[in-house]
Design a protein with these regions (language model features):
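Active-site-proximal mixed secondary-structure blocks
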Residues: 1-121
Length: 121
């Protein structure tokens, strides 16, 4: 069996059905956020979520700094938010492209069908 290259692997895993979320947190520089599809429930007792972020991500840095984060579950009409938060554009541009509020010290994107505010463990 041939070993797939990274491009082939990316194409295949991109076909896996999953919800789309934006993980958000505040840092000293303001709100940070990144599109994440590697998000799942980890436990019901206690209630825990698992989120996978790139080690070099500004959002991961913000999550670690804040000790809390939001998981914004995007709706069908929020494709623009998914695309903007998946890019490396300046944070100010990302946050100017969506309406958001501060809730429980976490940035929450308005219009999401659901969101979860989490503490870091």
């Amino acid at each position: 069996m041939a070993v797939p290259d990274t491009q082939e692997f990316r194409q295949v895993v991109g076909l896996l059905p999953t919800g789309v979320t934006v993980v958000t947190a505040f840092s000293g520089d303001g709100p940070a956020g990144a599109t994440a599809s590697a998000v799942c429930s980890l436990s019901l007792e206690p209630m825990m979520m698992l989120v996978c972020l790139d080690r070099g991500s500004r959002t991961l840095h913000a999550v670690e700094e804040a000790g809390r984060f939001g998981i914004n579950v995007l709706g069908l009409d929020q494709r623009n938010a998914a695309e903007v938060f998946a890019t490396k554009v300046p944070l100010e541009e990302k946050w100017q492209s969506v309406a958001w509020i501060r809730h429980l010290e976490v940035p929450i994107i308005e219009g999401c069908p659901a969101y979860i505010v989490c503490g870091l463990h």
